[in-house]
Every structure is written in structure tokens, then in C-alpha cells.
């Protein structure tokens, strides 16, 4: 989906509008986006100071069910968290604005949450209301004066009297808009008509112009307007003005609507009132002197300006990593950007840069940057902390914010909340977190906070008991991955990462955390939170609160994705009160891993039916049936139930472990790791689920299945390690903590899973045993449902794996690691290239592989595992998470893919791949936490992804040595895989193979496709075993890495996140190092690297630091570097598709998959990716940039492509040769303004089409390359992009478009 050009002005925009795709694609290329792309609009709206206005996506949030305004609205509104906009999360950096001012829709949360949230918000709102009221009164007063003046000037004749009355009426409306009245000194002239006409105008035109706004004000209901208009009108104009460039019409429409809405809302909801932040005042432009007065501008600001300034203005590409280094989640940064970026979308002016820096600084201190106007309160410019670190300093603040983190988790989708702008949770839920922070945080924080707190307490005790350091660390790792997510939603871990998570609950939680892990607040808290959750969940297993946060997060996340689904899910949770909290928490939890999971879940929610089933099944086996049915259905109908797919997976899980909804939920929860809380009601189930939860996150039922099966069938295999561990650990699980600790030591993720598994294993063993056994046994026989679920899961896992991988690679460098990301991506890519293109995925897969290797390369496993596992762990397996994530971003596709086991394999695979990337990106944006969070576990892996690459690489290398089959199997994976998978060892191999092929798509494709393709049921189930186990094993291994290492790596990662990332970019050689370093070295290099990186991050002078951060590559090498990453990702996507389809043993199934709607959509996306590679290939030729790696990548892509064409012919999708011929797009010397016409990715003319132009679209409406869609282009940061190039880049390479310049030599 993300790859599809999309229907709006820009494919991206269209995608943005889409629940998942859009967001993913929504890099702030708002310029070309059309209003329809609500997601994009945010970008345009970035300029709006008025969050309210930005709410087009947020309407729901604001309580204005503005959904009508944007189709996204409804989605966005879900759960009060604009899921739709959420996608922006992918590009939260720019597109978050929409959420910026999102107010959580109070009503959307559970009463408890709402209450708490409401109380907090109420105070804030009341204050704002008071301000608004005062302003309104003042305005009214002015208005009255004006009115009197007007009246006095007009002799009140009878006729005039009517007019006066009319005027008065109008004025009443205008009441709050005396200013407007002034603006329209002659309201008398059009007073009569103004009422309706103005209102209409407002609604209709919502002119960006002041007059339009005035009209709006005039027309809007007096009361509403009074309260809201003041802020809103002010904001509106500002917004409009800011937006004007971006999407005048669009913005204005939404803005006006918003204004109205705001007024209504404000009136309707006091909180809403806040929606219109009075601060937005007309004085939007009112900037503190230290922004425009050069003599007062701090040196730090000037240095950053110098670093980023280019002859053409401030280079966003250079600024991005610097901002990312603030440790704020991308979402938050996106909101800040949106608030400040008023002139050119994607580019800041000097003053805007200073504003952004100041807002970042403020946000880091835990004060949400609601609008630039708030800066005027500061006598001197606040100096942001821009280091590689996630800003631990704010943690304390963060903690308060952290709570929102939980909500953030849920909000991650929301992302926008400037409020939470600081939500660390941003990383995953980062985006969400920030949003939540703004509105959700309060209540979620309560919920989450509370729960978290309880959880935390438990955890605290546990931690304090000493497990905190070891266990916690280990656990941390595990949590980092599994709990990290949790913590995110639990909020906190991520929040911690982000200096100002802004989650209050977090704060409490963090307080605990702080006490416990002040030294490593980021990672610890994150893990802690998660751990807390987990433990607590384990402990309380279901503290409702726990559940709640989970639910909350989840719900929120879900809500973001699909309120209904989530709600159902929530219901399913059986802890209805927890539902909302669950929502919140979950998302938070999901923030990182959970976010992805949430996505999956979200997708699930998408499937109302599934969800319903969930709901109905909610508390019992009943669910099973529905799920079974659903799953089967999902499986068959996968397409429809994408969410169902997710849900289906869940359902399958549920059926698999029909133990109960909790289980199901657990599954989802699994994702959240919060599953524990999620199944508050059913401890056993929950335990199951939990066990699953963590383990099964990737393959929930599978986990059990896997475990059981593994236990039964695969105990011997390394994969089984996790399973076995589960089995073995059950004893360990005797004491949750023991298990946890042991597992933690072995692998937090595993521990969690194991533990859960133990807990639930026993239980699960019964429950699952049947299910599992049957499922497992049915792996082959009962594939349909169980397997499917498993397959589903597998796909998810793979996807997850991929995603994790991607995340690390792309999202891996979240926080200030934009470059890091690049570097990461590059490194991953390079690694891939080094490894043979598999490294990247290998990393993620590697973790799978590693598990297979079973500890041979724990560090590698750790890293990769962490990537995978960390994420996987997070969700138990990020796989699920990633899955979810994938689903989330590629919700439709992924969902469908997920739903359709086969599709999961095929479309899903691709989705995953793309989504993965997207998600990764998303995470990336808000990912510093994510990464860090994930990093906790994955952090080391991810965070150390810097280190990771080497670590991973060695691991991989080792892995390779160890499991040569991995690579080999990769080759025959499709064919032999089934066998392999069937055999335990092979399973492992397979996993490894998967790893090998792992490039995002590979992983998903290998694993997923294989399961899907080969034996959906068998393969998947088996595979899931492997996948999961691999993950788990990898996870455990990664955990094995040692908490110490984890922490180190995590801490380093924090640094690494930012600096490491640039270091990564700077030292692409690292991968070589890792590669060269043998597995033994893995740990050392990993460690060293972390240390060096962290030291490096800490030491460099600000100027150098920024230079490092920007990860500047020599210009002549930059093209090769960027294209290498691009082609590497494309190869992954295409290879994943190919492997997926190759993995389907039955040609009938393969044909069915390909010809299904999802299959075709998926393949069209793959075709689109291939077309991007063809464009890039021409760009490479045109610029004469030549490198062996690029040539090899192109060859590999063509090779895989030619293989894939055979499948496409089954669905008449084979692209016309002309559609792949972009020779007419090459920019020849002499073309004026060639520089402006060059696509920032492929350097081809954005206005030219492939030669397929003449082909009428109706001829092959299914083709992605008719001239219509081919013509989509976007503008961002001073560059133009083909929609598909930008879309692909943002989703599969990195969240920030590369902005390549056409070399003058052309």
C-alpha cells in the first residue's frame, strides 16, 4: 500500500490518507499533497500554530468528529487517536502537526482513563477556557464598541434597524471575533448575509484569508466560536497562512471546519476548548526577541544554523539528524516542525529554525510545545540538548510525560500531539506518545501510569530485588524488546528515551524507574516500564490497571488504527475497563514493538468482524470459534479481514489458544507484552497469552504452538531454544521472576516469552497444548486455522523480523539518528551488500538465525535478535509487532496480507516489507525511543545497530558459517524450506535462511512466503516455530548478550541513536568490522562500538557533532551511497515477493494468492518498486555514478525480477516494457530548471512519464503505471519527487527523502 502511488495529489498523500500507507508515506512532502491526504495536510498544516486547525486529521481527537472533513478523520479519530493521521507517524517529523493539537477525545477513553485524563485536562482546559473566555469577553467588548460605533454611524432607520438587528445577530456570532469585525469594519455591509453565507464560506472556503476566517468566526455559533474561535480563528489564519502554500484549499477547508468544529468542540468539550489553544492567538507571529534579534540568538542556535545553512537555505537533510538527536520522538519533532514551518513546506527559515530549536528545548524539558507563541514566555532562548542521547535529563519530566507515553503508545498514531510532543514514546508510539501526551497522556497516563505504577511497583520490587539490574537489564533487554514496547505504552520506556515523554503515568512509573534505574532511565525505564508491566502483569497478571494501560495503549493504538477493532479487542480483553487503558497502554507498549503489534492489532480491529469476534469471543472459547472461524475465514477471506488477519492471527491464536479472549487479547497484548494486563481477567489465559504474549507475539498461538510443537517436535532445535526454553523454563517459570531473570539472562524476550510461556505454557500447555498440539500437529494437518494463524503469525513474524530489521535499519537510527538511520540503513544495506544483500535482513533475520544458531552468536543474535527480537521481544516478538507495524502502516495491505495467510505471505510479505520499512521508519522517526526502547533489547542490537551492523554481521557471518544452510537454504528455502521447516533443525535453518534472505522482504518473504507459499499451514506453523523461536532464541541469545551489554549497548545506543547513527554513516566500515570480526568479536565490537560511539557522541564539539550527526558523505559518494540503500531495499522487497511466491508449493494456491485482490495489489506494489529501481538505474547511468555494489544490486534485482515475472503472468500483472522505460525522463543538459525538475531519488524528470503514457488507463486499471498514477509527484524540502520514488524511499529506505541534487555535470 505504501508503495502504491495513491490516489491523491501525491500517491504519498493518498497513502497517507489511507490508514496505514498514508502515514507511512507521508513524509512531509506536503507540498504536493492535496487536502484529501489528510496525512499530508498535516505537513502543510505544519505551519499552523493552531493545533486545532491541524486537526483535520485530529478532528476526532479534538472531539470534533470531524471525520467528515477527511476520510482519514474517522480513522484518525478512532479511539480518539487519529489513526489515519497516525500514518504520519512514519513521517512524523513533518507530518505530525495534525496531531499536534489533537486533543484526545475524552469520551473515547474508558471512564477511568477519561476521568483522570479529563481531570487533568480539565484543569488545563479550564485555564485555557478562562483565557479564551477573557479573550472572548475582550473581543466581545471590542465588538460591542465597534458595533456601537457602527450603529452610531448608521442612523437607525427602520430599515436600518433590521439591519442593525441583523448586525447584532451577526455580531453575536462574531462576538468572539471582534478582531475579525475590525478586519471587516463593514460587517454592516454584509451582515445579513454573513450569517449563513459566512458560515458556509467558512465551511466551504475556510479561506486561508483572514476574511474567510472572519467569516468563519462570524458565522460560527456564537458560543462555540466565542470560546473557540478566538484561538481557532487566530489559529486558522495562521494556519491558513502557513498552509497557504501547502494546501490552501485543503487546509482552509479543514481549518474552517476545524474552526467551527473547534468552536463547537470547545463548547462541547471543555477539553476541546483547549483544542483551540488560546496561545495560538493572532499573535502567532509574535515571536520572542531572541528569535529575530541576532544579538540575542544563542550561539548554539547559530551553530546549528551554520551547520545546516546552504546557499539555497537551510538544508533539511542536515537539520534532520540534528533535530533527531534531540531525543524527541519523530512525531513530536514533526509537530514542532509543523508548528514552526510556515513558509516553505519541508524547509525552515532562520527564524523558523530557531523556533524549532526553542520548541525542542522546551519540549525536552517536558513542556509540550503547543505553539511557537508559548516561546514568548521565555526571557532567553531555551537551549535544546542535542546529543546522541535521548535526553535522559528530561526523563524526570519525561516521566510525567512518560505517562502520556502510555497513551502515547496508543497515541503513537496520533503522533501529533505536540503536547506529548515530547513523548519519548514517540519512537514507536513515539508519534503516538506525543499525541497522547497532549491529550491522551493525562488519562492514559493515569491509567497507564497507574497501572504502570502498580506494574512498576511490582517490577520495582522485582527489579529492586536485584532483578532490576540483572534481571531488569536482561529483562530490560527483553522488555527492551518486548517490554520496550510495553514500556512505551506503559509508557515509559520510550518516554524515557524521549526526554519528555510527557506521560504522566510514566512519571510515576518512572519515578519508580527513576529510583530503580535512574542510571539508565532510558533503557531501564523503558524496559522497566515494560518489565514492570510484564512483571506486574505477571504478577498481577492483570492488574486491571495494567490491563488498562495495555488496553489503553492498545486501544489507542488500535483506535488509531481501528477503534472498533481495538475496542473489540479490548472487549475481548475481557477487561472492559481495561479496554481503553489497554488501548492506551498497548499502544504505548506498542510504541516500539507494540506499535507495530498494535498495528497488527489495529489491523485486527480493522476487521470489525474479527474484532467483533474478538469481542464476542472476548471472554471465552467462544472467541475461539469465531476466531477459528474468523481465522479460517480470515485465512480464506484474509483479504477482508486484514485486520481480521491480524485479528485472525489473533483469532487463530485465540482458536489456537482458545483459552480465551484474553488469550487472543494476550496475543495482541503479546504484542504489547502488555498482553498480561490485557488479559487481566484471565490470568491463566493471560499467562498463556503472556507467555505467548511475549513469545507468541510473533506467533502467539504459534508461540505456544510452536512451543508445544517445539517442545514436542522441535525441542531439540535451537529455535526450540526459546520453545524449549519455554518448556525448560516452565520450571524456571516457577517463579515468574526466576524465569524472567533466567530468561532475561538468556534473553529477556525469551524470558518474557518463556516465562509467559511457562506460566502460560503450563496453562498454555493445556490450552495450548491442545490447540498447540493440534495446532502444531495440525501444523500440517490443521494448517487451515491453526497453521494459518501460525502462518499468519509467521508471516507476521517474518514480517516482524523484517520489520524489526527494518526498524533497526531504518527506524533503528531513530532519534537523532537520521543520518544514523541513513547510516544504519546504509550500513544495513551495505551489510546486505557485504553479506550479499542479506545482511540487513539478516540482522533481523539473523536474530532468527541466531536463535537457530542458538546462541552461537548471542551478541549477533542480540543485535540482530535485538533488532528482530528486540522488537520481536518487545512484542514478544517484534515479529508480531512488526507485523502489526507493518499492518499498521500497510494496514490495508499488510492487514490483508496478514489476514490472508497466503497473502500474508505474498501481499503480506510485501506489505510487511514495505510496511516494515515504513514502520521502521515510523519507529525511526519516533524511534529513537523505539530504537532505544527496542534498543533496550534491540537497542543494543538496534541502538547498537551502529554496533549492530558489525555485531549483526559477525553474527550473520558466524551465522552463516554456523548455518551456511541459512544462506543456502535461502536459495532452496522455497522448495526445501518446507522440508526444512518441517524438520526442526531445518526450521532453524529456515529461520536462518530467512535471515539470510532476510532483507526485509526476504525475511518476510522467506519466512512468510514460505510458510504461506509452501505449506501455509505447515510451513507457517513450523515456520512460526522457527520464526518465533528463532526470534526467541535470538531474543534469548540477544538477552544472553547480557543485560550489562544490553544496557551498555542501549546507553551507547542512546548515543548511538544519534551519534552512533552518524557514526554508522561515517563508519560504514563498521559493518565491515562486524563482518570481519568473528562472532566472538561480536560482543566486543558491539561493546566497543557502543562505547566509542557513546563517548564519541558525548565528546564532539557541537559543530563536529552536528557534522557527524548530519553524517555528511562526500558528494560524489553520496549518490552511490543513497542509491545503494535504495536498491538494497528494493531488492529486499522484490526478493521477498519472489521468495514468498516461490515458497508456495501448490501452484493452485499460488495462483489464487496472486489473483486475489490483495495479491494483485501487493504485486502492483512490487512492480512499482521495480519501476523505482529502473528509474534509479537510469539516474545512475545519467550521473555516471558507478560502483560494483550498485551494479551487483541491479543485477540481483533483475534476476529476481525475471523470476517474479513468471508469477505476475498468472494475474496479467506483468508490466508493459514501456512502463519500465524511463529513458524519456532523463534530464538532458540544457534543460532549464533541470535542477527543479529532478526527482530527489532518481534524478529523473518528475514531469515525464514512462513511455506507457499512451496506454489508456482503463485498459489495465490494475496496472500501477498508467499515466495518471505515474504522474504523481511531491515536493518536499526544496526537491520534487516522483510519488512512487518518494513513497518507496520513505517506507523502505528511510523516513526522510534523500533530496539528491542533479549534478551540474549533466
Swiss-Prot record:
Q: Which spans does this entry mark as compositional bias, Polar residues?
A: 993-1005
Phosphoserine carried by residues:
471, 576, 715, 744, 764, 804, 844, 847, 901, 911, 927, 974, 998, 1065, 1067, 1079, 1090
Q: Gene name?
A: Synrg
Coiled-coil regions, chain positions: 113-153
User: What protein am I looking at?
Assistant: Synergin gamma
**Which ranges belong to the motif DFXDF motif 1?**
455-459
Could you tell me what this protein does? Answer: Plays a role in endocytosis and/or membrane trafficking at the trans-Golgi network (TGN). May act by linking the adapter protein complex AP-1 to other proteins. Component of clathrin-coated vesicles. Component of the aftiphilin/p200/gamma-synergin complex, which plays roles in AP1G1/AP-1-mediated protein trafficking including the trafficking of transferrin from early to recycling endosomes, and the membrane trafficking of furin and the lysosomal enzyme cathepsin D between the trans-Golgi network (TGN) and endosomes.
Which GO biological process categories is it annotated with? endocytosis; protein transport
Q: Where is this region: Disordered?
A: 176-196, 252-285, 460-494, 559-601, 697-730, 986-1016, 1065-1090
Residue ranges occupied by any EH domain in the UniProt entry: 293-404
Point out residues bearing the modification N6-acetyllysine.
Answer: 509, 736
Q: Where in the cell is it found?
A: Cytoplasm, Cytosol; Golgi apparatus, trans-Golgi network membrane; Cytoplasm, Perinuclear region; Cytoplasmic vesicle, Clathrin-coated vesicle
Q: Could you tell me the keywords of this UniProt record?
A: Acetylation, Coiled coil, Cytoplasm, Cytoplasmic vesicle, Endocytosis, Golgi apparatus, Membrane, Phosphoprotein, Protein transport, Repeat, Transport
